[in-house]
Amino acid sequence: MPDNASAQQPGQPAQGPNEHYHQPLNQPRALRIGVAGPVGTGKSSILATLCRELAGELSMAVVTNDIYTDEDARFLRSAGVLPTERIRAVETGACPHTAIRDDVSANLDAVEDLEEAYGPLDLVLIESGGDNLTATFSPALADAQLFSIDVAGGGDVARKGGPGITGADLLVINKTDLAPHVEVDVTAMVADAERARDGLPVLALSKHDPESIARLADWVRAVLVRHRSGTHVPTDPGPMAPHSHSHDGS
């Protein structure tokens, strides 16, 4: 923060210990897209793909979430998809959904720090730590949500439902190039997903298929156009199902 950031300005409320940076009202805030999905479904690969496709035309940054490590951030930095300083890691220390839905302050701090340091930004991608089929972002953190499943998880995954599958702005069925090896019918899997999503978009994606990558990038561009025009309204896919985790090794 600038040296004078803590000084109270006339007409501003007193600033407490949890002070946040906010984009000036006359500057558009970056579009924030959350990327969620179970462990191993290719979320980091999706982020890397989007950075490669869009960084030449948009000013971008990335925030990753892991429980105890910065593994995803290190993967993206090593891939060279963005300047390393534009990739921030949040170590949640708790269940992945906590930091993207229940208490988003750590992620908001990371996003706002990036906007202050490198703004104005066009796009910030926020990757959730791997969780289950019900993980979703709070609309207070993400303007739009992409949920990733993959063919290696089984051809019936989309039929299992959950708010991420049924209500995210975009459902990605990832790693379609692996379908022959795991005996999954991608066409049937897409059809199941479309039935579950009642008209919301579904994208079959492979990092080896330029056409599917182009469709993914075009989806982001379309959301950004709506965001800039003020016509995009963040929606909440719904809360996670009641559940519990044990992190004490018992």
From Swiss-Prot:
Q: What GO molecular function annotations does the UniProt record carry, in alphabetical order?
A: GTP binding; GTPase activity; nickel cation binding
Q: Which family does it belong to?
A: Belongs to the SIMIBI class G3E GTPase family. UreG subfamily.
Q: Tell me a GO cellular component.
A: cytoplasm
- Skewed-composition ranges (Low complexity): 7-17
Signal sequence segment: none
Q: Which organism is it from?
A: Streptomyces griseus subsp. griseus (strain JCM 4626 / CBS 651.72 / NBRC 13350 / KCC S-0626 / ISP 5235)
* Principal place of residence: cytoplasm
What is the protein's name according to its record?
A: Urease accessory protein UreG 3
Q: Which UniProt keywords apply?
A: Chaperone, Cytoplasm, GTP-binding, Nickel insertion, Nucleotide-binding
Task: Describe the function of this protein.
Answer: Facilitates the functional incorporation of the urease nickel metallocenter. This process requires GTP hydrolysis, probably effectuated by UreG.
Q: Where in the cell is it found?
A: Cytoplasm
> InterPro entries of this UniProt entry?
CobW/HypB/UreG_nucleotide-bd, P-loop_NTPase, UreG
Q: Name one GO biological process term.
A: urea catabolic process
